[in-house]
Curated annotation (Swiss-Prot):
The lineage of its organism: Bacteria, Bacillati, Bacillota, Bacilli, Lactobacillales. PANTHER family: OROTIDINE 5'-PHOSPHATE DECARBOXYLASE. Keywords: Decarboxylase, Lyase, Pyrimidine biosynthesis. InterPro entries: Aldolase_TIM (IPR013785), OMPdecase (IPR014732), OMPdecase_AS (IPR018089), OMPdecase_bac (IPR047596), OMPdeCOase_dom (IPR001754), RibuloseP-bd_barrel (IPR011060). SUPFAM superfamilies: Ribulose-phoshate binding barrel (SSF51366). This is Orotidine 5'-phosphate decarboxylase. It comes from Streptococcus pneumoniae serotype 4 (strain ATCC BAA-334 / TIGR4). GO terms for biological process: 'de novo' pyrimidine nucleobase biosynthetic process; 'de novo' UMP biosynthetic process. The keyword Transport does not apply. GO terms for cellular component: cytosol. Substrate binds at residues 11, 34, 61-70, 117, 179, 188, 208-209.
């Protein structure tokens, strides 16, 4: 099922910065928020408890990649935090992903990173020594993720349709790198607008700087949300 709220990437360096940002929104508004490495390492698990206590949904974006037993144990801890979604690197392999699923349980969604949206095909071929196309690599990882019993993948919107064809229509495609028209793309190599992401079949979208660095973050959020959901029935 598609998520109507764009996920806001809380790419802030401190707990206080998050509090200041969220204070801009009405207290009764439930948001879907992404906590990444920078914020999690700065603020610790308490940031998740704080956000959940405010009634928000949390995507904990730590991209775990380690031996299966270590990942399983880490996921058990994350499940106790009450996260709504978290992720691993598909490159860790099927056994690692299965261990992650077992550790996390079924209450939260578990997705895998295929190729980062900052990765170009040339970079992948040179530094990862993967001598296929970028799309072929993404499809391969998506199939292995489905085989491991995970809920979906993080992927570029350009890859959504081929991933759903290679797996199944209900396989979640979470798309970062979303930028409204006219907004700088930053360090993302593969980007798309919210409306385009909807049309192509993305289930979740993640938006960071176009909201967090906007002159009016609340207005920017609602404009992106409106664009994302404008064609929903």
């Amino acid at each position: 099922m598609r998520e109507h709220r764009p996920i806001i990437a809380l790419d802030f360096p401190s707990f206080e910065a998050v509090k200041e940002f969220l204070a801009l929104f009405p207290a009764e508004e439930s948001l879907y928020l992404k906590v990444g490495m920078e914020l999690y390492y700065a603020a610790g698990p308490e940031i998740v408890s704080y956000l959940k206590g405010l009634g928000h949904s949390v995507f904990l974006d730590l991209k775990l990649h380690d031996i299966p037993n270590t990942v399983k144990s880490a996921m058990k801890i994350l499940s106790q935090l009450g996260v709504d979604m978290t992720n691993v690197h598909a490159a860790g392999g099927v056994e690692m992903m299965k261990a992650a699923r077992e550790g996390l349980g079924s209450q939260a969604k578990l997705i895998a990173v295929t190729q980062l949206t900052s990765t170009s095909e040339a970079q992948m071929q040179e530094f990862q020594n993967i001598q296929t196309s970028l799309q072929e690599s993404v499809i391969h990882y998506a199939k292995k993720t489905a085989e491991a019993g995970l809920d979906g993948v993080v992927c570029s919107a350009q890859e959504v349709q081929v991933i759903k064809q290679a797996t199944n229509p209900d396989f979640i495609c979470l798309t970062p790198g979303i930028r409204p028209a006219g907004v700088a793309v930053g360090d993302q190599k593969r980007v798309m607008t919210p409306a385009d992401a909807y049309q192509i079949g993305s289930d979740y979208i993640v938006v960071g700087r176009p909201i967090t660095q906007a002159e009016d973050p609340v207005a920017a959020y609602h404009a992106i949300k409106d664009e994302w959901t404008q064609d929903w029935n």
